Amino acid sequence: MAEPFLSEYQHQPQTSNCTGAAAVQEELNPERPPGAEERVPEEDSRWQSRAFPQLGGRPGPEGEGSLESQPPPLQTQACPESSCLREGEKGQNGDDSSAGGDFPPPAEVEPTPEAELLAQPCHDSEASKLGAPAAGGEEEWGQQQRQLGKKKHRRRPSKKKRHWKPYYKLTWEEKKKFDEKQSLRASRIRAEMFAKGQPVAPYNTTQFLMDDHDQEEPDLKTGLYSKRAAAKSDDTSDDDFMEEGGEEDGGSDGMGGDGSEFLQRDFSETYERYHTESLQNMSKQELIKEYLELEKCLSRMEDENNRLRLESKRLGGDDARVRELELELDRLRAENLQLLTENELHRQQERAPLSKFGD
């Protein structure tokens, strides 16, 4: 019975030497009791070979061989030439594995070339899929793994790299140097553009803002001394001039006439703006009330003005006395100026002999 089994086994199609390694392998357990059937899932078509009927077993319900008479699974590793076949045939042709068949024990079978090909080791197994090398390429594979494990060389930053610093963190000296450098660069670029005939825009700087800011406040002390000195007559004395100069300079704020006018104008503008805003925010009743208050204030000021006019008329006789005092003051100033000129002449005459004696 071994010869028909081997002949049918040899006629099965062979795709490669590793077809048996890809399928699920399972060795027969020698301790399994005889006659035990191996249950195979019906859903998996790989385990049901309908194209090739089973040999050496009883016919099934559909005319095929029973599950007991399946050929032994192929081994993934190399087996001896005759031991694999004998172990696979034990469950089918042995006396203790067949339930109802009276088959004699198989005779010794000579190894065929097909059986030797099936018994060769598989080189395309999972080990080769994971990248395991063959026996001859172990060194090359190890070298590739070492190269992959090496870290890439990372270049260090250049030591000559300029560290940038924000402008607001610079010191005063650093800001000054930076501004000078930028101005020189802008001037150079403008000169190059002008030489090429291209239109040149003015240097973009904020200095004009500072100039406008400085011009907002008037020059309070420019030309005050010369104008006041030219307006003074020759009959004034040095003491009177110093006193008048102190009055012209203003109070403790040190601002002259132009400064006081500027402050007065600024105050009036601010007051008008505030008054306008307050009137716009008032309701109609509040505006009527404010108008009545202003009329009362106007009538009161008119009464005060009339009273002061009457008093000035009563004191009209004192105006002549005031004029006489003003004339007397002018005469005394003229005498004082004459005395000053005479004193200066006497000093010059006293210095002349001393200069001759020194020579």
Swiss-Prot record:
GO terms for cellular component: 7SK snRNP; cytoplasm; intracellular membrane-bounded organelle; nucleoplasm; nucleus. Keywords: Coiled coil, Cytoplasm, Immunity, Innate immunity, Nucleus, Phosphoprotein, Repressor, Transcription, Transcription regulation. Residues 202-205 are annotated as: Interaction with P-TEFb. Residues 283-349 form a coiled coil. Residues 286-314 are annotated as: Mediates interaction with CCNT1. It comes from the Eukaryota. Residues 148-163 have a biased composition (Basic residues). Residues 210-250 are annotated as: Autoinhibitory acidic region. Changing L332A: Loss of oligomerization. Disulfide bonds: none annotated. Residues 150-177 are annotated as: Basic region. GO terms for biological process: activation of innate immune response; heart development; innate immune response; negative regulation of transcription by RNA polymerase II; negative regulation of transcription elongation by RNA polymerase II; negative regulation of viral transcription; positive regulation of signal transduction by p53 class mediator. The modification Phosphoserine is found at S97, S98, S233, S237, S252, S260. It is found in: Nucleus; Cytoplasm. Residues 310-355 are annotated as: Required for inhibition of ESR1-dependent transcription. Induction: Up-regulated by HMBA (hexamethylene bisacetamide) (at protein level). Down-regulated by estrogen. The keyword Repressor applies. Residues 236-251 have a biased composition (Acidic residues). Ubiquitously expressed with higher expression in placenta. HEXIM1 and HEXIM2 are differentially expressed. Expressed in endocrine tissues. The modification Phosphothreonine is found at T236. The coiled-coil domain mediates oligomerization. Homooligomer and heterooligomer with HEXIM2; probably dimeric. Core component of the 7SK RNP complex, at least composed of 7SK RNA, LARP7, MEPCE, HEXIM1 (or HEXIM2) and P-TEFb (composed of CDK9 and CCNT1/cyclin-T1). Interacts with the N-CoR complex through NCOR1. Interacts with ESR1 and NR3C1. May interact with NF-kappa-B through RELA. Interacts with CCNT2; mediates formation of a tripartite complex with KPNA2. Part of the HDP-RNP complex composed of at least HEXIM1, PRKDC, XRCC5, XRCC6, paraspeckle proteins (SFPQ, NONO, PSPC1, RBM14, and MATR3) and NEAT1 non-coding RNA. Transcriptional regulator which functions as a general RNA polymerase II transcription inhibitor. Core component of the 7SK RNP complex: in cooperation with 7SK snRNA sequesters P-TEFb in a large inactive 7SK snRNP complex preventing RNA polymerase II phosphorylation and subsequent transcriptional elongation. May also regulate NF-kappa-B, ESR1, NR3C1 and CIITA-dependent transcriptional activity. This is Protein HEXIM1. It comes from Homo sapiens.
